[in-house]
A protein has these predicted regions:
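Hydrophobic membrane-targeting and insertion signals
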Residues: 1-2, 72
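N-terminal acidic leader/helix
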Residues: 2-34
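Short, charged early-sequence alpha-helical segments and their helix-coil boundaries
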Residues: 39-73
Length: 73
């Protein structure tokens, strides 16, 4: 399945960001499959881009934590 990356993102950025999202979920003892993790990660990356952020570890971690809190995960 072909995915659409957010602007200026690379496949490497996606993988790096997925690790961050997975670590956050693991710390909450939440298990999801790779497809779900990728969907959440792409959403977080899109939010980061829309807010003027980049795909650095610190920025993605902050947006991911906020996103997961808002959606109730």
């Amino acid at each position: 399945m072909k995915i659409s990356l957010p602007p200026y993102a690379t496949a490497e950025d996606l993988q790096k960001c997925m690790v961050i999202v997975r670590e956050i979920l693991d710390s909450k003892a939440i298990t999801i499959n790779d497809e779900q993790c990728q969907a959440i990660t792409l959403e977080v990356m899109g939010i980061s881009y829309a807010k003027g952020g980049d795909y650095s570890s610190e920025v993605i971690k902050s947006f991911a934590e906020s996103y997961l809190k808002i959606v109730g995960i």
